Amino acid sequence: YQWKWGYDYLKGEGEGIAFLSTLDVSQRAMSDAGKPEGDNYLLKVDHPLVVPMGKKVRIITTANDVIHAWMVPAFGVKQDAIPGFVRDTWFRAEKPGDFYGQCAELCGKEHAYMPIHVKVLPQDEYTAWVAGEKKRLAALADDPAKVWTLAELVARGEKVYAANCAACHQENGKG
């Protein structure tokens, strides 16, 4: 996923949860306008990695394009993601909150737009998040017999464009 982070929960309570995490659209708009705002400029994402407090979390990295590096300074973690190799590291977050990092390898023109947002929750809140996320993913699962309306298809296409295409082609499609 070029200039995005993909997260797959492979084991444990969240097993089966998977998503892409990319720079929040509002952050990209601030950057394009040359008007940075807020303390977490270029660090907010559309879908943070959510982990339980006090548990060992294993991060497995790889890449399919160039070398990246998953780095969150508050956890003392930096692991390179190298095409063709599987690498791992771990951390244990001891307090709840939002923690930020970035790709720590100069990986191309969108390198500055690869933030990492880890949301650490107490165990009971994490369990509730997992349950909600599994329900959300189940609701998104396509019914092969569903007949899509034009409005539904347009809405889905706009969401895909905003998440995957607008970074290069601009929100107005004229990039």
What are these model-predicted stretches?
Residues 1-166, 171-174:
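Non-transmembrane, membrane-proximal soluble domains of secreted or membrane proteins
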